[in-house]
């Protein structure tokens, strides 16, 4: 059953303070939690104010001078009480000029002493002068708090801003905070930027910001963020190509020109083919200098693709450089080992295992004998001899071998 009221007014009404909100019908599972009270007699609603009652539908009244009569729209039954302070609108044409004087919606939700849901008051205000000159919409939504047994609070807050048409953007901000028990604080924040134009244009959706902070899971978060970037780039690229196909198809059908229109689809050059300026400079200069309705889509796509390609190029160059360095080290080691084998071939043939009671004296005598007998004087030959001693003996003798080798060389080659 719906309550319909028709009222004519020669002039827009003035804003008046809202009366106390009338009582509302609660769900059956919440009636036991609210103390029963005798509802007061609601005041007679004026022609510009319609309120909700216990057994009737909520009525929304909208005044429009161009229609010649008031428009009354019945909403679905609501379990929430709300009241309209005033609505004043002047509409000349839906697709042309839409000057708006003032619209303000005030609603009050009774405090529910329920362990799961807690709501508060809020309002919706809409003010502007001309639809094609300046249009602003702001929604201050009350905090929505959920409380679950053995869990912490979960808070969701939303805010909407609409600025048309010179800015051509609808900003929708959604913040979600989660607190998990037995864990550190988890912050999950999502920001959405939606580009919404008039019906004759298209609607585009861009994921503007995604932030997820989880302690001890930085690597997983980084991988998820990289995947999200890939999805965003694919989505934006698909929307951009779909828009161009749509426009070209419309032009062909209207002009009956079935010529070569496919190459014109990609007539705009991608920014990664222009290496003369940096991607950030191209990105921000394009956003500031252009005001067309698809500038943000193409700018974001081009910037992300450019940044990803440059990152891939840097990684490839670094990998190539590291590979070259590794190959050079391997060649040096190969030459060193080959030189060591060629210069110490006679030493290897004369190697023998010996049980020594004085290793330092035996190492010294052996080194002196090898240097004198083979007339070793070059630095490469001495280095090969040292590497031979180090490789043929256990690790615990390395310090002694190095010390004795230094003493032998200092004594034999002292000028």
From Swiss-Prot:
Keywords: Nucleus, Repressor, Transcription, Transcription regulation. This is Probable transcription repressor OFP9. The gene is OFP9. GO terms for biological process: negative regulation of DNA-templated transcription. GO terms for cellular component: nucleus. Residues 327-336 have a biased composition (Basic residues). Signal peptide: none annotated. It is found in: Nucleus.
């Amino acid at each position: 059953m719906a309550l319909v009221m028709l009222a004519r007014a020669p002039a827009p009404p003035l804003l008046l303070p809202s009366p106390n909100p009338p009582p509302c019908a609660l769900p059956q599972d919440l009636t036991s939690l609210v103390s029963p009270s005798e509802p007061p007699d609601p005041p007679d609603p004026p022609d510009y104010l319609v309120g909700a009652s216990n057994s009737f539908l909520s009525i929304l009244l909208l005044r429009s001078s161009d229609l010649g009569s008031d428009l009354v729209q019945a909403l679905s039954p609501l379990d929430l009480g709300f009241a309209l302070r005033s609505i004043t609108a002047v509409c000349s044409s839906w697709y042309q000029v839409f000057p708006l004087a003032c619209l303000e919606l005030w609603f009050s939700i009774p405090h529910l002493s329920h362990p799961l849901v807690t709501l508060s008051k809020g309002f919706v205000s809409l003010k502007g002068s001309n639809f094609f000159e300046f249009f602003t919409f702001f929604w201050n939504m009350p905090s929505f708090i959920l409380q679950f047994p053995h869990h912490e609070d979960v808070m969701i807050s939303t805010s909407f801003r609409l600025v048309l048409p010179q800015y051509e953007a609808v900003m929708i901000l959604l913040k979600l905070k989660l607190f998990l028990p037995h864990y550190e604080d988890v912050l999950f924040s999502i920001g959405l930027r939606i580009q919404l134009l008039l019906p004759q244009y298209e609607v585009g959706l861009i994921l503007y910001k995604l932030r997820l902070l989880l302690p001890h899971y930085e690597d997983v978060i980084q991988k998820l963020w990289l995947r999200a970037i890939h999805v965003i780039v694919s989505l934006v690229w698909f929307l951009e190509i779909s828009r161009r196909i749509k426009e070209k198809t419309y032009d062909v059908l209207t002009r009956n020109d079935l010529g070569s229109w496919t190459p014109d689809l990609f007539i705009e050059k991608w920014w990664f083919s222009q290496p003369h300026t940096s991607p950030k400079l191209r990105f921000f200069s394009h956003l500031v200098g252009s005001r067309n309705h698809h500038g943000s889509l193409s700018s974001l796509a081009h910037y992300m693709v450019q940044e990803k390609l440059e990152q891939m190029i840097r990684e490839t160059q670094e990998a190539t450089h590291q590979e070259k360095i590794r190959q050079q080290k391997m060649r040096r080691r190969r030459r060193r080992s080959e030189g060591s084998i060629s210069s110490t071939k006679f030493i290897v043939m004369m190697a023998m295992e010996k049980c020594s009671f004085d290793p330092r004296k035996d190492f010294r005598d052996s080194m002196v004998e090898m240097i004198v007998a083979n007339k070793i004087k070059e630095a490469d030959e001495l280095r090969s001899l040292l590497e031979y001693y180090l490789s043929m003996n256990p690790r615990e003798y390395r310090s002694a071998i190095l010390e004795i080798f230094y003493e032998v060389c200092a004594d034999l080659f002292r000028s």
